[in-house]
Regions:
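Leloir-type glycosyltransferase catalytic cores
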Residues: 329-379
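A donor-sugar binding/catalytic signature common to diverse glycosyltransferases
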Residues: 286-326
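Donor nucleotide-activated moiety binding/catalytic core segment of transferases
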Residues: 201-209, 213, 262-265, 269-296, ...
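Catalytic donor nucleotide-activated moiety binding site of glycosyltransferases and closely related
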Residues: 152-159, 192, 234-235, 240-279, ...
Length: 379
């Protein structure tokens, strides 16, 4: 194993490893690194395996199947594991081709031995949420080698649930490990300021909006189908109503339907939850080339906006506020369907992107200010 290179900034998030190997998690870290590269900040993505991902691993489901003598479910979960391992390999290949990532994979224990990073940036996602196993001290820079380094939290999320009294005490303590903090949930800014007792916290936009669509086009797979298609990006919670509406819309408009499955909840049969075996580059290509996009995925919406696609957004039960946040930041709340009938109307992307210009510029300035010593070549 090669030694780790000394880096000014270590990016830590759900990057290479996330529940079900989420495409959005990989792409927000890719985008954040590319933006730091553009502004001249030496950085590396830490290959970090969070404990919550391990707790949600299908291996645990297989173990419980064995204990309960559920052998049919065990067999189906073994097949699911095979699917996930293939997807994991595609993620590894993506990061190897497109990102600067640490040579070694770290967990919260081995992360304590990483001493080649000048400061850490905890980069977006639900990194500050109380997940299975509690808070992740790696994400909260609460390890001895991570403290006192002017760390930055960029557009982090603590989930949509209210924070308990005990968790509030912990978060207030953990927040002291960071010199600068921004969150992505526009509905909880004042609430979070009160929780951690800091007034310097601000809102920033998801990292995928920090770089241009051309940066994604460069890595997107070229998609060639004989017929135009509706893309259904079904994420986290299986939404059968969304699928039905997509097929109805496709039939009415003489379009094919392509589906990306990336969900873990609300499925009737285990085999329904098997992930679509495609790589990150193909996901980008499918979104870029679709005629219409139906999605309950937060990052599905983000890339629908980036590629200026006509899309319809659907709510989720869990952490729906992030979907509402991105729609509001682009003044596109009318794209949320819920129980409404599909009423097609073209999106005015000039207006939508002008509306979001201020928050995008503010987010870039936040990063530049937080890391200005590195940009200027200081210590």
């Amino acid at each position: 194993m090669k030694k780790e290179k000394i880096s000014d900034v270590g990016i830590i998030s759900f990057s290479l490893h996330s529940d079900g190997y989420n495409f959005g998690a990989a792409l927000h870290s890719f985008a954040f690194q590319k933006y730091l590269d553009k502004i001249g900040v030496d950085n590396v993505i830490i290959n970090y395996f969070p404990k919550s991902v391990w707790r949600n691993c299908v291996l645990n489901d297989i173990f419980m199947n064995i204990i309960k003598f559920q052998f049919i479910s065990m067999f189906k979960n073994i097949i699911k594991l095979f699917f996930i391992l293939i997807k994991k390999k595609k993620f590894h290949n993506f990061f190897k081709r497109n990102c600067n990532i640490t040579n070694k994979q770290y967990n919260v224990k081995s992360l304590e031995k990483l001493n080649t990073i000048s400061r850490f940036v905890c980069e977006t996602d639900v990194t500050w949420a109380h997940l299975k196993g509690g808070y992740d001290r790696g994400f909260l820079c609460d390890l001895p080698n991570m403290k006192n380094k002017k760390n930055v939290a960029y557009s982090v999320d603590f989930g949509s649930k209210d924070i308990s009294f005990n968790d509030a005490i912990l978060l207030k303590k953990y927040a002291k490990n960071f010199d600068k903090i921004s969150i992505r949930n526009i509905f909880k800014l004042d609430y979070f300021k009160n929780i951690v007792d800091r007034n310097d916290i601000t809102i920033t936009i998801d990292p995928v909006f920090l770089i241009d669509s051309t940066d994604y086009v460069k890595i997107a797979e070229e998609i060639k189908y004989e017929k135009d298609y509706v893309l259904v990006y079904n994420c986290q919670e299986n939404n059968t109503e969304m699928i039905e509406k997509a097929y109805k819309y496709a039939k009415e408009n003489s379009l094919d339907v392509k589906i990306i499955n990336c969900f873990m909840n609300n499925y009737q049969k285990i085999e329904d939850s098997y992930p679509t075996l495609i790589g990150i580059e193909k996901v980008l290509g499918l979104i870029k080339n679709c005629k219409f996009l139906f999605t309950n995925s937060y990052h599905g919406i983000c890339f629908g906006i980036i590629f200026e696609k006509e899309f319809f957004a659907f709510s989720r039960k869990a952490n729906n506020e992030k979907i509402l946040t991105v729609l509001r930041l682009f003044n596109l709340e009318n794209r949320l369907i819920n129980d409404k009938e599909i009423m097609p109307c073209n999106i005015d992307y000039i207006s939508a992107k002008n509306f979001a210009t201020e928050i995008i510029q503010k987010s870039k300035l936040f990063i530049e200010d937080a890391l200005k010593e590195k940009i200027l070549g200081g210590g």
